[in-house]
Design a protein with these regions (language model features):
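Mobile, glycine-rich extracellular loop/lid and propeptide segments
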Residues: 1-211
Length: 211
């Protein structure tokens, strides 16, 4: 049986991805380059269960980390493809050089805002190549990478509004100028947002109430 289906369209190549879990054991990753007329697939082995909250994304190669090879060689896919998921107390993220056919590099993001119930793997990419993850933690935070997933940094925000107990998933989005917007549920059950205009390096510390 399958569950947690998720779709993604690469904003640069127009490749359409379809992923879903096979229980909590492994993940099926499929893609099409002809608008669904035919599909290729990768029955990706996510390692020992439990694997949950799967997400796939893609974005430009950078000139650092995993991007050194990805952006320089014509043998690699035009964009970096990321597959992330939750493994109970931490998030796992992997990078593909071949458009999602395999995920050879990456691992568990241990020690970066992933303890305390970091139940999320919802990766988001920006046009400048920065990739973001919103962990489900007590203090609103963002994990981000500027080298296509080799290294990650953490930034916090929202200490003026906090989070509820039990916590809820947050979400992050980016715009065409690579500004980033993190949205989460505050301690009063309101929806709040913080913005970064410098590719994730700093975030508004006065939270904006959305609703």
């Amino acid at each position: 049986f399958t569950n947690d289906p998720y779709g993604w369209v690469d904003p640069i190549t127009d490749r359409v991805f379809n992923i879903h879990m096979m229980g909590l054991w492994t993940t099926w990753i499929g893609w099409t380059d002809n608008d669904g007329e035919s599909w290729e697939a990768n029955p990706h082995d996510s390692g020992a269960p439990v694997n949950d909250h799967i997400k796939l994304g893609s974005g430009p190669w950078t000139n650092a980390g995993y991007g050194i090879g990805g952006g320089a060689s014509s043998s690699f896919y035009e964009t970096a493809v990321y597959f992330c998921y939750n493994k109970l107390a931490y998030i796992s993220c992997y990078t593909s050089y071949d458009g999602g056919a395999s995920f050879e590099v990456g691992g568990n993001l241990v020690g970066i805002a992933t303890a305390n119930g970091g139940l999320h793997g919802a990766i988001t990419s920006a046009p400048d190549g920065t990739v973001y993850l919103p962990p489900r933690v007590a203090t609103p935070a963002i994990i981000f990478s500027k080298d296509n997933g080799l290294t990650w940094e953490e930034r916090t925000m929202g200490q003026d509004v906090g989070t509820p107990n039990p916590r809820k998933n947050g979400e992050i989005a980016t715009d065409t100028e690579s500004n980033a917007y993190n949205v989460w549920v505050g301690g009063d059950q309101g929806v709040y947002m913080s913005r970064s205009i410098d590719s994730g390096n700093s975030w508004d510390q006065t939270s904006i109430r959305v609703r």
